Amino acid sequence: GTLRAIEAALKSDRLVFAVAQRDNTDEPTPDILYSMGVIARIGQIQRGLGGVQLLLQGEQRATALQYSTSEGYMTAVVMSVEEMTPLNDHDPAFEALHKEIRERAAELGERRGLPEEVVHQVLDSVTEPGRFADLVAGYIELPVPEKQGLLETLSVEERLRRVLVHVQRQIGLLEAQEEIKSQVQEELGERQRE
């Protein structure tokens, strides 16, 4: 079904409705799909032995109003959903939050061993705060229900806060792992000297 849907999208406007599943199955039914997803444009497509890999560019949050199946794949009637931006995005507290998540996201990328210039190139490519929160959320390892929760958080400020918490948690995890590694190395060094 998914391959047929991709083929159909490629023949028309290249738009798909990307939505997460509650259960991992090859043939999803509407009842296991979350209602909110993203209208996305198919960018690159790579076909390989393991199937098809797509690069999707998210364009707009949307909610599925109705699903139907025709020609072997599922289609959806969707309604776009607007995010809630702060009344004043030059509010000092909002600007500070946006700056903090940018700095912590860069730190996380570098701690994961990515080259600094690559991290900054990716992060600097998005200036709009809501899109930035979405970009960072895409790089964070989270269970599907948590990622879905971020997608459904329409307040940009709240989404930035929630993503920042996840980023800080992952930095803390990496710090703890580095600490454990260094303790193990120390113990190994002491044992070798004995």
Q: Where are these predicted regions, by residue range?
A:
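N-terminal low-complexity, acidic/polar interaction/targeting segments
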Residues: 1-194
